[in-house]
A protein has these predicted regions:
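C-terminal and inter-domain tail/linker signature
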Residues: 2, 10-18, 25, 31-206
């Protein structure tokens, strides 16, 4: 059985990301809306702990939330790791404490909770002032503003996180940092993410 929670519907719902915000966004929605099973709430709480540890740069706690054979895949760039050592090495070298530049803002658009996974739909914005290895590997900071819609699929097995699959529109990101010219191509930039936040914005004319 799946439960979907609509959390924010307008760009005005965007809030500045902080450790306190990340630590609270999962619990606050579930408790406000109600209706999650004990197992579903346990998955939400564990993922909350996982993200909070990532933002704090706490590698040991991050890994403690994962099972014995996890995998992590940032789908557009194929960045991540397989197995505890592979995932641990990726977190240590490229992610924990290096997630986003300091001005990042994040809003949860929706959440879908099943029996073995949580799917979080997010709108994220930031200025590309630091290297972001998982998103733009090998690309030096451009100073450009970026807005992106992100879907995070988190799997659970035996009470721990078994995998994370993270999806976003990489073409849109490349357009915004100046690495892809959208002229003549069926791609969009920041407006694509904005329409996820506000579905009433005009669709592309075809």
């Amino acid at each position: 059985m799946f439960q979907r929670r609509k959390l924010f519907s307008r760009a005005s719902a965007m809030v500045a990301l902080s450790t306190a915000f990340v630590a609270g966004w999962f619990k606050s929605d579930a408790r406000a809306q109600g209706g999650y099973t004990v197992n579903q709430q346990a998955m939400i709480d564990l993922f909350q702990k996982h993200v909070d540890a990532e933002m704090k740069g706490d590698l040991e706690t991050t890994m403690a939330t994962m099972n014995d054979n996890p995998h992590l895949n940032h789908v557009p760039t194929m960045a991540g790791g397989v197995g505890r050592e592979g995932v641990r090495a990726f977190y240590r070298d490229h992610l924990v404490g290096k997630f986003f530049p300091p001005d990042v803002k994040m809003a949860s658009i929706s959440r879908t909770v099943g029996d073995t996974q949580v799917v979080e739909e997010l709108a994220i914005s930031f200025t590309h002032t630091t290297a972001i290895d998982w998103l733009l590997p090998g690309v030096a900071p451009t100073g450009k503003s970026v807005e992106m819609a992100v879907a995070v699929i988190v799997g659970f097995k035996d009470g721990k996180i078994s995998h994370e699959h993270i999806y976003w529109d990489q073409a849109g990101v490349l357009v915004q940092v100046g690495l892809l010219d959208p002229k003549g191509l069926p791609v969009s930039g920041a407006e694509s993410a904005r329409k996820v936040v506000d579905p009433t914005l005009p669709a592309r004319k075809i």
